Every structure is written in structure tokens, then in C-alpha cells.
From Swiss-Prot:
Pfam families: Ribosomal_L22. Part of the 50S ribosomal subunit. This protein binds specifically to 23S rRNA; its binding is stimulated by other ribosomal proteins, e.g. L4, L17, and L20. It is important during the early stages of 50S assembly. It makes multiple contacts with different domains of the 23S rRNA in the assembled 50S subunit and ribosome. Keywords: Ribonucleoprotein, Ribosomal protein, RNA-binding, rRNA-binding. This is Large ribosomal subunit protein uL22. InterPro entries: Ribosomal_uL22, Ribosomal_uL22_bac/chlpt-type, Ribosomal_uL22_bac/org-type, Ribosomal_uL22_CS, Ribosomal_uL22_sf. It comes from the Bacteria. Belongs to the universal ribosomal protein uL22 family. GO terms for molecular function: rRNA binding; structural constituent of ribosome. One of its GO terms (cellular component) is cytosolic large ribosomal subunit. The keyword RNA-binding applies. One of its GO terms (biological process) is translation.
Amino acid sequence: MEAIAKHRYARTSAQKARLVADQVRGLSVDKALNILTFSPKKAAVLVKKVLESAIANAEHNEGADIDALRVATIMVDEGPSMKRIRPRAKGRADRILKRTAHITVVVSDAKAGR
């Protein structure tokens, strides 16, 4: 049994979100939530919300036991970048890329070996 949750166009760079995702990959959901709760990174809040959504999906849609769930897969892909302009001296301008990320979390019970 698997349950999926996604956060598309998350306002953080994929590089920064991957640092957080790598910490919880393969852990049980209660351990992962504990790590994310006390992480000082902004991306930890985003990943935690997606993980909580995946847990709720597993409980509601599949009737899963929350204590048996673990983070089977967690992926952070790049989303589109928003282009912004910062004015500079002598009429020039610099381009700023405000990056986004797509965060995908898959939780499964221990019986579904992967």
C-alpha cells in the first residue's frame, strides 16, 4: 500500500530542499516528522507539510496504520524559475531567478517491500 502527496511550485530551490529530503528518506514517519519539526531550515516546513499530507492520504484513502508507515520515496525536482529584474547602476539590470521546486513524498507500510 502506497500513498502519495505532492507540493508543486514550492518557493524554495530544489538544492536546498534536497538537503532536508535526504535526512528523512527511508525513515519511519514518526521519526521523520520529529527530525523535520526541529530542523531550522525553511524547506523542512514545506517537506513536513507534504509528509503530513501523505500520511493523511494513507490513513483516509487506504485505511493504513500510521505506526507502520515509512517514507518509501521522497523526490525534489526543479520547477520553473520566476525571472525578476534588479536595477543596477548606469541603467543596467541584473536578472534574478526565483527558483521553485516540486516535492513528492511516497509513504508505504513495511509490508510493501521496496
